[in-house]
Amino acid sequence: MTEVHPGEVELDFAREWVEFYDPEDATHLIAADMTWLLSRWTCVFGTPACKGTVEGRPDDGCCSHGAFLSDDDDRARLDDAVKQLTDEDWQFRDKGLGRKGYLEDDEYDGKPNLRTRKYKGACIFLNRPGFAGGIGCALHSKALKLGVEPLTMKPDVCWQLPIRRSQEWITRPDDTQVLRTVITEYDRRGWGEGGADLHWYCTGDPNAHVGARPVFESYAPELTEVLGEKAYAELAAMCRRRSGLGLVAVHPATRVAEHRATPTSNGVQPSSL
């Protein structure tokens, strides 16, 4: 039995999946979690619903720990983005461009790995309450000001969250190989051993499953980036078809949120969890 976190659904529940081949690559098999992609999760940062992953720091959201960089391309994109930030965009620009910089050495999976520097308890790119430019990720806010997708300026792990992509080569019975890409929810377990210790995490909280659109639509740019345009178009068509038929394994957090939002016949809201 999985550990229960107050206000969140359990980690283990039924999910529906679909597998299809990349229209542009017959050796690329994509497995997509329809339960997650058809959920109504949405980012609730900056609202009372966001409690933060670290107790006592709700204004950090999920930015308390800094972001590990995935590769050289990830760092190059971040470096280019930093060059576009001004003092009006980034509260700690003087610190980030100072002697200690905006990156620091750490370890990931037992190997050396750069991550964004923590400053005053959170990622150095996180603008805090009271900053004239507003709270939140300086990179994200700058992208919106420029009219570009945030994924073009933020580290990979930041713009992909809470989409989890994993890949592995698998050998079929005839000894041929295909690359299998799995697209699913980045839940607490995605954070590793420390995931269970997070003060709060949004994907399991019904209060974050109040989006106007399902995840496959609200995260269309991100999914297109990780899968490619044609593969995403195929996935989106399948999601729309599945939604029309009725999903069997609805995400439990979405189900609770919808139940709360549906009045009973006498106009009284149903009880929560």
Residue ranges and their predicted role:
Residues 1-273:
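Short loop/turn segments that flank or connect secondary-structure elements
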